[in-house]
């Protein structure tokens, strides 16, 4: 454990979606603003795509943190690879409507619509976030997504559907025209720039308790060159670099340490 060596209170580069470590890069903030717009203005559906490790999941956690808990009921699904009835049952459970066994599909739809109407009657919005949505390969389940967006009153959608996924999700949605037409907000996350990487690393270190970054400027440039600005890869490389420097009792992480750590990760 290298925490004491680097004067840290927490591990700074864990690849878990802890919203406390969310870094407001320009691309993530634009995505977040688009999602907030979709929720606040009742746009029905929004889709955020990006490569593996670009920060989609932590973005969803940041969104949940920024939505007023008194105004919005948020359900999050991380395993959408389900057949239609199991999918609807999972949606109901995500909205805290539990069943020991999945009831018939028609009953699920009636109960879901009833839950959404009750939320609206209390002045609450309903938000369904589906992570790893590119995993939905059953066309029947995609049809259920479209049907969710048919749940409307005369002037608004009963819920906001947010799809997060890898780039394949864009092609998946393209092949389902009725669903594609209902997605009002779309955005693709970009990689972090060199400047962002510098700020990202410093941000995570500060959240973890550091007063000063142990990475040299050349080390940060090497981190960017190796990872191409992909947050998950940055986390892995920084963590390994801090560990390597600690094991060698080095007080400063330089380019040589980063290069060696990157080779260990390949």
Question: Where are these predicted regions, by residue range?
Answer:
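Conserved catalytic segments around the Walker B and adjacent sensor/switch elements
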Residues: 46, 69-80
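Walker A/P-loop nucleotide-binding motif
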Residues: 41-63
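Short regulatory helix/loop adjacent to the ATP-binding pocket of P-loop NTPases
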Residues: 63-67, 167-184
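Mid-core helix/loop region of P-loop NTP-binding domains shared across ATPases and GTPases
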Residues: 3, 83-86, 99-130, 134-144, ...
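A short, basic N-terminal segment
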Residues: 1-42, 259, 263
